[in-house]
Amino acid sequence: MGIPEKASEGVYTYGKGNVYVVRQDPKEFVMNERGDATLLKQVEHAYGQLEYKNHFYLERGPYVMAAVLDENAISNEPLQLQGHYIDLFDPKLPCMEVVKVNPGEQAFLFDIDAVKDAMRPQVLAAASRQYEEKVGERSFAFTAKSPANTDNVMRILLPKEPKKVKVAATYQSEWDAKTRTLLLQFENQPEGVQVEITW
């Protein structure tokens, strides 16, 4: 970066941006009352106007993580998300169009609208690993493996409503037309459970 190791406090240009050198022990920002004021002023100077929120929101591919703080210094409003989500914290993997995250709560979601190649059948969430996936013109087959004496709940994205579902175990299924996802539930087997879906 070309900045001397013992450079004095200040702003140094690097590439298309800047580097701020702060010669202060980071623990002082949290140990002293209002110790963060200096750091916040520097951040505001670097980025312009700061926007304070009571939540953290992070997207990584189709995964969404959100947490709302209950330290109502900023706001005690819940975070509300709209779209088509699978709630990954709920073992029943429900589909939701509106997700409300209250102060003191967290959410871990799968954003169905963010799926690439949404017309290709694929398992979006499951309590198993899928092997030997085979995608046909009007079919999708795979083997689901997971430890014995555990229940499998999975949400599968399909191009159309299934006409036939074959599972090598007793199962329950439910179609969600808005998200084009099939909810499948059955008991796991370590040697695998074969699933075949046709539409």
List the model feature ranges, each with a label.
Residues 82-98, 166-185:
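Solvent-exposed beta-strand/loop surfaces of large extracellular or lumenal domains
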Residues 71-74, 80-83, 147-150, 157-163, ...:
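Short proline/glycine-enriched turn/loop motifs at strand-loop junctions of beta-rich domains
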Residues 60, 136, 176-178, 189:
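Structural motif
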Residues 187-199:
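Surface-exposed interaction regions enriched in Ser/Thr/Asp/Glu
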Residues 66, 142, 165:
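Hydrophobic, well-ordered secondary-structure elements that form the walls
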Residues 135-152:
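Proteolytic processing hotspots in large secreted/extracellular or virion-associated proteins
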Residues 96-99, 131, 142-144, 183-187:
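Beta-strand-rich interaction surfaces with strong enrichment in secreted/lumenal proteins
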Residues 1-137, 154:
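A conserved amphipathic helix/loop scaffold
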